Amino acid sequence: MAEDDLCSLFFKLKVEDVTSSDELARHMKNASNERKPLIEPGENQSMDIDEEGGSVGHGLLYLYVDCPTMMLCFYGGSLPYNWMQGALLTNLPPYQHDVTLDEVNRGLRQASGFFGYADPMRSAYFAAFSFPGRVIKLNEQMELTSTKGKCLTFDLYASTQLRFEPGELVRHGECKFAIG
């Protein structure tokens, strides 16, 4: 894909003009629904799981990094190392309205052991990916404390295969976590 095409695609996938967690949630649900026909086998089509190289898809998974890092990764076609063994993703949506950015940052730092999450701006930006069969679910989970003191648990996924296709990036943009 030519550099101009990549640049156009990157900006086309950016979530803009979203001001609340509810708006971002609706936007991401629509984006996920748009992707379903592209990643699910159609009627009368069989899907050989072994041939596809892994288990069935996990829906949208999120990577939390800063915007410049995401741009570099997108143009390079690879995920950043944000974990000792590759890329760490989660099913924590970027519109979780009852958890603060600081708490998300703490959870990511604890789960990944990545010193880069010491700065909250490292997790203020998200990239939503659809990796059918390309990630593994880890045995550990990320535990966060909500703004009301409730324990929230999110799954963690790993990808040691850091190359990705532009079509696997579904959306990216600023997170809409609780302010606090």
Curated annotation (Swiss-Prot):
The gene is rolC. One of its GO terms (molecular function) is beta-glucosidase activity. This is Cytokinin-beta-glucosidase. Keywords: Cytokinin biosynthesis, Glycosidase, Hydrolase, Plasmid. It comes from the Bacteria. The keyword Transferase does not apply. The lineage of its organism: Bacteria, Pseudomonadati, Pseudomonadota, Alphaproteobacteria, Hyphomicrobiales. One of its GO terms (biological process) is cytokinin biosynthetic process. InterPro entries: Glyco_hydro_41. Hydrolyzes cytokinin glucosides thus liberating free cytokinins. Contributes to the root inducing activity. It comes from Rhizobium rhizogenes (Agrobacterium rhizogenes). Its EC number is 3.2.1.-. It is an enzyme of class 3 (hydrolase).
